[in-house]
Amino acid sequence: MKQTFQRVVGVAAATSIALLVVAGCSNDDSSDSAASSSTVSMAESATTSGSAAAVAPVELTAADGSTVRLTGPIAAKYAAATEKQKTDLGKPLTGEGASGTGANGVVFQQFDGGVITAKNADDATPAYITWGKIRDAWNVKRDESGAPAADGKGGSQGPLGVATSDETEEGTVKTSTFEHGKITWDSATNKVEVTV
């Protein structure tokens, strides 16, 4: 009885945390976007077996009509996104570089309007949406110091590393954090600042 109760509580906690993880994502092109974001560590959820409940796969239709299957933390993030966030993300991309696992273990799915990334494919790993001007700046190839460089690396393979938050907004400034820095975009001045 005690073990069954613990399992039910653990599954409920994991579900609640998964729903909280996605609060506050916004599209840089929208003037009526939400003003806050919440980051919650999935490590806080636990079940009696020590692992999070399995995440149900999500199937989407790409622009070319093919089916794209999201799994693990990418599926959890997409499933918990608001309808506005899903609309802003748009259709999933297909083809080379559109989805997969990077050399550093980061899992990702590119969309017309953004990307969802997670540090690894474990179901309990939080995933984040990066989009707009911040996504564009994150994808710029950079050297280890963060300066743009033709022979550098961009995105999660670059010096900023993987996303560690959804976009937050304070006034006209939107910010996304990464393992080794942050990117801000001011919608009033159109200025992007990268800090590594």
Predicted regions: what they are:
Residues 4-11, 15-196:
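Extended, compositionally biased repeat/scaffold regions that form elongated interaction surfaces
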